[in-house]
């Protein structure tokens, strides 16, 4: 028995797969989902979405967003979903350095910098 995982970005549906298990990178930790899980809605963090499919494991970096689980369907709404194999460690390191150099003298700048650093760190972890 499997569950369906659908990942949607503003541009298109990035993924629509049957999986035995889905691990979601929630903002406060990882959440595992299998068939029969109780319905829920939650906020995603920056991290790796993992699926265990019949053909093997799949991993995607997701750029925050929201997840909904209902009736053995996992719906993920995110800004970006990138297969981990396509991430470049050097580029992720550069992005993190740029985020750390952002100004943070006002509350608005600090909030923007914090989000950029969290995003870059998540992408760097995923690229390893």
Curated annotation (Swiss-Prot):
InterPro entries named among the record's database cross-references: ATP_synth_F1_dsu/esu, ATP_synth_F1_dsu/esu_N, ATPsynth_dsu/esu_N
Subcellular location: Cell inner membrane
Membrane topology per record: Peripheral membrane protein
Gene3D superfamilies in the record: F0F1 ATP synthase delta/epsilon subunit, N-terminal (2.60.15.10)
Pfam families: ATP-synt_DE_N
Coiled coil, from the record: none
A molecular-function term among this protein's GO annotations: ATP binding
Similarity-based family: Belongs to the ATPase epsilon chain family.
Quaternary structure and partners: F-type ATPases have 2 components, CF(1) - the catalytic core - and CF(0) - the membrane proton channel. CF(1) has five subunits: alpha(3), beta(3), gamma(1), delta(1), epsilon(1). CF(0) has three main subunits: a, b and c.
Protein's recorded name: ATP synthase epsilon chain
Taxonomic lineage of the native organism: Bacteria, Pseudomonadati, Planctomycetota, Planctomycetia, Pirellulales
């Amino acid at each position: 028995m499997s569950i369906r995982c659908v990942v949607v970005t503003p541009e298109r549906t990035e993924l629509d797969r049957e999986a035995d298990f889905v691990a979601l990178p929630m903002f406060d930790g990882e959440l595992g989902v299998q068939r029969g899980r109780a319905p829920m809605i939650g906020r995603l963090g920056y991290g790796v979405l993992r699926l265990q499919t019949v053909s093997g494991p799949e991993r995607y970096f997701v750029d925050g967003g929201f997840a909904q689980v209902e009736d053995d369907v996992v719906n993920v709404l995110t800004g970006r979903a990138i297969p981990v194999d396509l991430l470049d460690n050097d580029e992720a390191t550069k992005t993190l350095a740029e985020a750390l150099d952002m100004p943070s003298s006002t509350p608005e700048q600090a909030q923007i910098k914090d989000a950029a650093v969290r995003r870059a760190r998540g992408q760097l972890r995923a690229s390893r």
